[in-house]
């Protein structure tokens, strides 16, 4: 029985190391423009059901962040953004952070936010938001880069993603 647990632990560590080894760090853009949101804009326009890894978003909070309590993955913070799109258009997008994996990330109204993580399609219950970005933390599955969120120049997670 002990050897079974050791085998499972070793396999888990190898899988985590492989995921971390394949994940890459993506730099934060120097300015928030429609070009930063181009991939997200295409996903929104195509009504993509998602999820889609490695998507960037930037914008300004339209109100303060709010907490989403509990659940199987702990507390989350919801950051409501207005993002610039091509042609002077805008969209409302929600960035979701995980207190356990990212630290407690909050933002006041009017905060500049950049995030990189996994796109998800919103439900009618989440309107007026047309999309969301979550998994803005170190990669937890194969194919995902290390995610992050930046609020008014402060980057989260604040620890390195390297093992």
Where are these regions (language model features)?
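Positively charged n-region of N-terminal signal peptides that target proteins for export
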Residues: 1-4
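Bacterial N-terminal signal peptides
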Residues: 7-16
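OB-fold and OB-like single-stranded nucleic-acid-recognition modules
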Residues: 21-163
